[in-house]
C-alpha cells in the first residue's frame, strides 16, 4: 500500500481509532503522540459556526453523522489535499466548546487556543491535537472522502474522511497545555 507510516517517524505513538471514547481521552496526556485512524471530519471557518448553531438550535437530525466520538480537523478539502489551518481564528475557536458539548472528542489543528477554550475542552473531556501542516503526507493517508454537509461551501464544506495513521501531538488535555 502507498500509505505513509507516520508511526515510524513519531516512534512511540498511541494508536487511536474512531469513534473516540472517554476512556481513550482519559488515557491521554499533554505531549502524547497519536496516530488517528477511522472516520475524521474536516471543517473550518465556513462550516464550524453553522454546525455549532445547529447544535444550539437542537437541529442536528438533518446530518448523516453523529458528533459523539468525532474527530474534526480544522481544514478544507481541496485538490491540494488536507492540512490544518490555524485553530484560534474566531470562527473556529468559538465553535470548539459547542462541538465538544455535542460529543466531539478531538479538535485537530495548529496554533494556540485561549484559556477559556482550554477550560471548555476540559469540561467536556475533549482534547486539542496539533498536527503537522504537511498536506502531501496527510493527504496520502486519506482512504476515502465524501461531502456530508454544506456542499454549497465548496472545498470548505463539511467532509467525512476515512483516514489511516494521521499523526498528531496532544497539545491540550485535562486543563493542561504544551
What label would you give each PLM region?
Residues 42-43, 47-166:
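Feature captures the catalytic cores and cofactor-binding loops of soluble hydro-lyases/lyases
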Residues 22, 33, 39-43:
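Short, charged beta-turn/beta-strand-edge "cap" motif at the junction between a beta-strand
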Residues 1-12:
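Short, Lys/Arg-enriched N-terminal segments with co-localized hydrophobic residues
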Residues 95-97, 169-178:
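Active-site/ligand-binding-proximal alpha/beta "capping" segment
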Residues 13-20:
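Short, structured beta-strand/loop micro-motifs enriched in basic residues and often containing a Trp
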Amino acid at each position: 500500500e502507498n500509505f505513509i507510516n507516520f508511526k515510524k517517524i513519531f516512534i512511540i505513538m498511541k494508536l487511536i481509532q474512531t469513534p473516540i471514547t472517554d476512556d481513550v481521552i482519559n488515557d491521554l496526556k499533554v505531549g502524547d503522540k497519536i496516530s488517528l485512524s477511522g472516520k475524521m471530519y474536516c471543517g473550518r471557518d465556513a462550516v464550524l459556526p453553522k454546525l455549532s448553531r445547529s447544535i444550539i438550535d437542537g437541529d442536528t437530525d438533518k446530518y448523516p453523522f453523529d458528533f459523539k466520538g468525532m474527530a474534526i480537523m480544522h481544514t478544507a478539502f481541496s485538490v491540494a489535499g488536507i492540512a490544518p489551518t490555524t485553530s484560534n481564528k474566531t470562527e473556529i475557536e468559538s465553535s470548539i466548546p459547542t462541538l465538544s458539548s455535542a460529543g466531539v472528542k478531538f479538535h485537530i489543528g495548529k496554533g494556540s487556543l485561549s484559556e477559556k477554550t482550554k477550560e471548555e475542552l476540559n469540561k467536556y473531556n475533549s482534547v486539542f491535537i496539533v498536527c503537522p501542516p504537511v498536506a502531501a503526507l496527510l493527504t496520502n493517508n486519506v482512504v476515502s472522502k465524501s461531502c456530508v454537509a454544506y456542499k454549497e461551501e465548496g472545498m470548505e464544506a463539511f467532509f467525512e474522511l476515512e483516514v489511516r495513521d494521521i499523526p498528531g501531538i496532544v497539545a491540550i488535555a485535562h486543563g493542561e497545555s504544551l
